[in-house]
Regions:
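Glycine-rich loop(s) and the adjacent beta-strand/alpha-helix scaffold that form part
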Residues: 28-60, 64, 238, 249-318, ...
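A conserved FAD-binding loop/helix module that cradles the flavin
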Residues: 480-501
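Conserved redox-cofactor binding core of oxidoreductases
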Residues: 63, 73-82, 88-92, 106-108, ...
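Residue-level detector of alpha-helix initiation sites
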Residues: 16-17, 273, 477
């Protein structure tokens, strides 16, 4: 007997934060809807979708990370910054690399393009930074009537975003004061140096709780009897009947059997590389599919606060600082086109002398993220003659930095040194440019557009052009070049799509009720 339903109202492919947002909004606005969520990876945390940082036991947390690494579960991952600087091509714990096709001859490629396969997706492993986009990062056609800010606020509600979880971190005010002196002049109030908005909260006992898909699901989804979550389930294609999405074909990875689930609506939220893969495998191939792929070049540097003393007391769950204690934000602006994520650390990423002890929180890790110069030629393509470890069309990344990209990266290197000197004493000889793909913020591959002009995959409600009933979700929907962490924006766009489905479900139900009443009469 199949563990899948034969028919539902909505199928959601993928269980990351955006897939969870669809489930949450539909549970709130269409409580009678039958929803099936399908995830290729296993359940690695409790409740399902919870962030692995919330797992207290180190060994159990490590097992959860390994189980998230899909077909590369036993492959070595990065354990320290030195491995990256030494040129080792490794994924972070909880993720796995695209093993082939990540770069083509004469191109830059994305050498560390990575995935996570688990309930919660990368939302079980992320840094939880949730800044709002600014200036050219914003989506103009959603800004005209003020829709974007309301959607971002709703995204913050679903993700549980706060800005005060690290208020007790030592020296964070000093770090922000020194950064502000360098960059705040002539900036509007909302784009000045400030605390980083994070999807994290501190419990009454002092312990930090990091948001994953479990927080986005919320109690309303978990209590929804019409909602079901199926892990270890590979969606191989979206079914289309009479030009409209009509369901999915799914392979049960536990026994290898294939099943079909009929649905009124299908939402593909598989990530920015696998969502276009599912559409391609389904024969749904709009001109912009997989194109406008963009990552954020990432430059890192470290400095040390020298003129500080260890605080008399240290607040927190067990008295220890988290590695992200004192997270500060230098917002993107068009004049300074970088997103700055500044983290205070307990330990130095650079070896220090044995007789030079580190004051907790005095090591400052600076990271600047650069927005990509968008071009249609940057894309993930698919090879119908070859398959990946899951049996899906093999990916081929085409990705090239433009002259403008290289100029922005050089400017970012100068800027991060300036900021590092402003904060304290630099620990690095020079800035380090992370391998392309390191940000994990891949965007644009199923991008949203205001018109069906061949330059976008979906409409402003995330519905795929020309395929009614098929919606896409995730960072790939974002149509602008962003430098900030994209999760909040992606969840905000998912909220809009979910509302549209809820409206249609309500309208269809009302029509069916009227039709039934007329027939009975």
């Amino acid at each position: 007997m199949s563990r899948y339903p034969n028919e539902v109202d909505v199928v959601i492919v993928g269980s990351g934060p955006t897939g969870a947002a669809y489930a949450r909004i539909l549970s709130e606005r269409a409580p009678g809807a039958r929803i099936a969520m399908l995830e290729v990876g296993p359940t690695v945390s409790d409740p399902p979708g919870a962030h692995v940082k919330n797992i207290v036991d180190d060994a159990e947390r490590a097992r959860a990370q390994v189980r998230s690494q899909g077909p590369a579960a036993e492959t070595a991952t990065v354990t320290n910054p030195g491995a990256v600087k030494a040129g080792q091509r490794r994924a972070r714990a909880g993720t796995y690399l695209l093993d082939d096709g990540y770069a083509q001859d004469g191109e830059d490629g994305l050498p560390v393009a990575a995935f996570s396969s688990n309930v919660g997706g990368m939302g079980a492993h992320w840094t939880a930074a949730c800044p709002r986009p600014g200036d050219s990062e914003r989506i103009g056609f959603l800004d005209e009537d003020g829709a974007l800010d309301e959607l971002l606020s709703e995204g913050e509600r679903l993700l549980g975003v706060t800005s005060d979880a690290f208020d007790a971190a030592p020296f964070s005010g000093l770090v922000r004061e020194r950064l502000a002196a360098e960059v705040d002049a002539e900036r509007p109030a909302d784009r000045r140096v400030q605390r980083m908005p994070l999807a994290v909260h501190r419990r009454d006992d002092g312990r930090l709780v990091w948001s994953g898909s479990d927080v986005v699901f919320g109690d309303v989804t978990r209590a929804n009897r019409g909602f079901s979550l199926h892990d270890e389930s590979l969606v191989t294609r979206v079914l289309v009947a009479d030009g409209r999405a009509s369901g999915v074909e799914v392979r049960d990875l536990r026994d290898g059997q294939t099943h079909r689930i009929a649905a009124r609506f299908v939402v593909v939220a598989a990530d920015a590389l696998r969502t276009p893969q599912v559409l391609w495998a389904s024969g749904i191939r709009p001109e912009a599919l997989g194109r406008y792929l963009n990552d954020q070049a990432q430059i890192v540097f470290a400095s040390r606060l020298r003129d500080v003393e260890a605080p008399a007391t240290r607040e927190g769950g067990d008295g220890a600082l988290s590695e992200t204690s004192g997270v500060s934000w230098v917002p993107f602006t068009d004049d300074l086109p970088f997103h700055g994520q500044i983290m205070q650390l307990d330990a130095s990423p650079i070896p220090l002398a044995d007789d030079d002890p580190v004051v907790p929180g005095s090591i400052v890790g600076l990271g600047l993220f650069c927005a990509k110069d968008l071009q249609a030629s940057d894309r993930v393509a698919f090879d119908d003659s070859r398959v990946d470890a899951y049996g899906m069309p093999a990916m081929r990344i085409h990705y090239t930095l433009t002259d403008r990209d290289r100029a922005v990266i050089e400017r970012a290197k100068r800027e991060i040194v300036r900021l590092g000197n402003a904060v304290g004493e630099p620990l690095d000889d020079r800035p380090f440019v992370m391998p392309l793909g390191s940000s994990l913020h891949y965007q644009g591959t199923v991008r949203m557009g205001a018109a069906d002009d061949g330059a976008s995959v979906c409409d402003p409600h995330s519905e795929v052009w020309g395929v009614p009933g098929l919606f896409v979700a995730g960072n790939g929907v974002i149509p602008t070049a962003t430098a900030c962490n994209p999760t909040l924006t992606a969840v905000a766009l998912a909220v809009r799509g979910a509302r549209r489905i809820a409206e249609r479900l309500s309208s269809q139900t009302a029509s069916e009720q009227v039709s039934g009443a007329v027939t009975a009469g």
